[in-house]
């Protein structure tokens, strides 16, 4: 699973995912990309599930770039615990995704556009947000 090696703070404040993405909103490496149409927290398990879905479909004929990383820890208090007495313990690691952010990029060695779009479509089913598939050079 993806998670940072070290963090400055174990339990950071919650970050807003409202608004548009300021960075990573251009297709840099691949021919096709999966772009977020709405903001959300995406967990390390969801990122890994999407990566596995893409790589299994492409079967070594392509390359996948993951442009998001779960830097933020979300905390949760145990069940049936009264309010107060501090913040809960870190439960999972999430990536903050805003509208317009390029999540994954794909390039197929056989230059098959069909394979690239199908791999991204399979990955989009593993994510909790609405996404769109964009070709390199097209407007995001």
Curated annotation (Swiss-Prot):
Record Gene3D superfamilies: Ribosomal protein L10e/L16 (3.90.1170.10)
| Gene Ontology cellular component list | cytosolic large ribosomal subunit
Please provide the record's keywords in A-Z order: Ribonucleoprotein, Ribosomal protein, RNA-binding, rRNA-binding, tRNA-binding
CDD domains membership? Ribosomal_L16_L10e (cd01433)
Q: Name one GO biological process term.
A: translation
PROSITE patterns (UniProt xref): RIBOSOMAL_L16_1, RIBOSOMAL_L16_2
Q: How does it assemble?
A: Part of the 50S ribosomal subunit.
- Which family would the database say this protein is a member of? Belongs to the universal ribosomal protein uL16 family.
Protein name in the entry:
Large ribosomal subunit protein uL16
- In the record, what lineage is assigned to the organism producing the protein? Bacteria, Bacillati, Mycoplasmatota, Mollicutes, Acholeplasmatales
């Amino acid at each position: 699973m993806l998670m940072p090696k070290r963090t400055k703070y174990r339990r950071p404040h919650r970050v807003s995912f409202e608004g548009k993405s300021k960075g990573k909103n251009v297709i840099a490496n691949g021919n096709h990309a999966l772009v977020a149409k709405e903001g959300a927290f995406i967990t390390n398990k969801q990122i890994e599930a999407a990566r596995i879905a893409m790589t299994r479909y492409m079967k070594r004929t392509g390359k996948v770039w993951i442009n998001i990383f779960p830097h933020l820890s979300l905390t949760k208090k145990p069940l049936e615990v009264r309010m107060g007495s501090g913040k809960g313990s870190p439960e999972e690691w999430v990536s903050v995704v805003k509208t317009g952010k390029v999540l994954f990029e794909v390039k197929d060695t056989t230059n098959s556009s069909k394979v690239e779009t199908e791999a991204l479509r399979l990955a989009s089913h593993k994510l909790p947000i609405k996404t769109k598939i964009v070709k390199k050079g097209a407007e995001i």
